[in-house]
């Protein structure tokens, strides 16, 4: 495995996410020509094109775009003509901003589109990101970034070559309760954090869906929702893991889960002594919690990772309150502000690549029965 980046770099990117502070000088000067107001809001909203009009785009992203301050729905990419017609009528999208997967390169001539949001199956993220980058667009790609580190690196290289930004859809990095957890940990209000627990899963339905196809998904619940537990642990530890151990239990339905794991339990170890014990599953509903155990008490979120209703608690009885927000609107606005103010995103492709590397190491550990070192 390749070495992880330094803790200093990790803390720098986390601080950007929490505070939204501009850097002393632009680090990506080549993107400045498109949108360069000195204050957010002085120019038009950035146009977002959604690539893939499945459940997430239909029920979360498109409605969220209507609530954003700095974004607007400007285009769509779909392989289904009836969806194109429906979205055109619902959101007033002009014909010139409706594309198929085979015509995405034509976005290069469409100045109404600034950002392409990739919402296709995991194994297609590189394909669609590269097309968007070559059309000169910034890219927000849903998690996980891809199904291999090689494809992740290709995405990073192509977007960098285009002089654009690549962000990964880690919505919880901007969710107020998660930021409150980070504050309590950083300020050591309960002492140093020693142990982190995180669990997220649900009972998956349709056995024919792409999430149960390894070629498209790259894996099972670990790639889909277990990544939230990985991200939570990294955020509180303020580091990337240096060693991982994974275990996949016996499957309750070997036919349905013939291609991917049904569940996984795993442990992440960090260089600062913190460890994280995590669980993810496609077997049951209701698994949605995250806890930090510190020297003088614990604090956590239940539910922790859902789109709505996240709640915080502390063992000392003090409140861990934060506003309820549309997490996708907050995420997209953050990326838009980064582009407008020529500031690098805190959830860049390099973070997505490291997480894919971590998950591949977890699969290796589950397969071999051994702990896998990452650095």
Regions found by a protein language model. Give the residues of each.
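N-terminal secretory signal peptides and thylakoid transit peptides that target proteins
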Residues: 1-18
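Beta-strand-loop-alpha-helix segment that lines the small-molecule cofactor/substrate pocket
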Residues: 114-115, 121-122, 126-173, 188
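NAD(P)-dinucleotide binding in Rossmann-like oxidoreductases
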Residues: 250, 254-261, 269-332, 348
